[in-house]
Amino acid sequence: VELLQNVFGKHGRDIWKKAQGIDHSPVIPYQERKSISTERTFEKDTTDHVKLKSILTAMAENLAYQLRRGNKLTACVTVKIRYSDFQTYTQQRQIPYSAMDHNLIPIVMDLYKNLYQRRLLVRLVGIRFSNLVEGGQQMHLFENDEKIANLSIAMDKMRQRYGDRAVLRAVGMDAKTIGRWNPFTGE
């Protein structure tokens, strides 16, 4: 300690403490989320496409809402299917950054359509949004996104004021048990 203090002055003691692993500053864990996801395992395996699409729509809508609440955008959508024989298949697609339902739900449905090929009972479905970045939604210059964005903003405000299930797409209303909390803030 004395040698370090002679060489480095008042910082010598700090260097010695750090070399000994002595540090009384608080540990502040922080890790940026890399993805958000949700899955649903069915009580009874099913081949009911209406039910599966309803649940996937509700999941995508919920995750997109979580992205917007956390001021995040996703660039990768993954859909997962596990069949009754426990074979699990996933498919993903890279997309332009988005957090808007009208962009994400059709991609989820397309991936589901590509994945559901085996004609077996489905045990589990899931969705993951990854490659997350901070940011708001980018509007396209020549598309009519403004009305849709305003609709999403209004729906989000209603959800924040009256609860997450205050406004739902009709197709997703059967998915009554989709959890709706914000993984970015823990709310």
Ranges and model annotations:
Residues 1-121:
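DNA-contacting surface of Y-family translesion DNA polymerases
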Residues 95-187:
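Acidic, metal-coordinating catalytic segment for phosphate/diphosphate chemistry
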